[in-house]
């Protein structure tokens, strides 16, 4: 008997007089220890199927089926959701939330054993675990989820953790239920490539060690190829193709699956070009520190951005990549004036640009706009799209009020929406459509530089392609410069003419995108590129088998921050932080490129990769 058996599942949503059929006649099974991936675009019904299996459909939804059974009941299944912050209580420590789950599961297990026992052997089983037992079990689960400093982490709140750590905490909470089936709904969306690989490797390891089945839902074909043994492809609420990972990725039968694979393969196309040598933005030696809590009475200094300099030219896209917490978003907020740097300066077309607190004018603010990562959080759910797009016009007064409605409707058409969408609310749109609205709002005051912070991280490959194509077209028509921030290396490669790789608050390598991708000079850049997920199962599984989970923190401020993870570390790396060595269009922060290491350089010296 299969661990999970679903036959002819149909899910309908009722909205006033309308009925929407989200899932139609879906059938599949999952065996013990098997990893099954469900792929498809946003809105294809993947998450709805998972929620129906777990009995978590919202009010107004109705599921019908011939069979939807989990061997042993739903208590044998657990679910890891896409956004861990939505399911973690921000006002309760991680340790308390984990211990609560352990205690509840223990009570239910004891109750079942007592009910099922015929000879009374289990009737004396305790109803509660002691605090020491809870602590021990919590640390064991955190270790299983790949968290080494469990005691320290249990005292922290969810908002104090990085995205990767929050996802590991949710995984530990799910494992507390001792599931035989783990449903993972987009578990690595919006995580950087190195953390993605670590989470996926951890899931595979747990599946093997516990003989636990995993039902993996993702719009990212690289994630599916990396982990899944068998793949189901969904479109418009139906399964259109099923087969082994090898069959689906190397010999797809349906045109829809072929189109998905073409979209994933097309992500790596190089299209970014330099179009001007006229400088738009100049950043000089920007530094930003934050004081964060370290225990109850002490604070420690976090060096978020360290001595960063860069230039962005008219009509250019400069790509910014790096893992979570490296300082990308902090730098973006400094550029837009939302944060004030501790030191350094910004110049816009040769004119000093202060922060908003230091008196940046409305005209200066208008010239630099930002598109935020979470479009749902950045759009007011109480306002219509028309009201949202009117706000920047009202603030900057760039148009006559009588022309606002016409400009709003024209802008919606420009970003691929319809004029009639102006009077709808944000909840009526898909994720890709909401991101188009966010971009439209940023374009309303006619900026000259657009800061894009992870604009497509949570979107499937086909919607990603549409958004990126739209951004390129807008750039071509208006000559806008982009500061494009992403953890997705293939997206940055597709958009950028130049790229900067950040680690621990500073640049470790900059250069033309093609040069950096084809011939990385810094060991960290090489690590990032090696961690990129491939939509080919043979490559993906081979790569993940060699992943090691790094537990070292970046080194102290006086040394190279990458030294604890570097395979080329030298004695000087432990004593001093390297500056950026410049060679034509390229810069690299590594002592391997110093004169002391490579020798004196005469006229015409040409540096090559030292790794």
Q: Language-model features: where?
A:
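Helix-to-loop junction immediately C-terminal to a conserved catalytic motif
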Residues: 54, 336
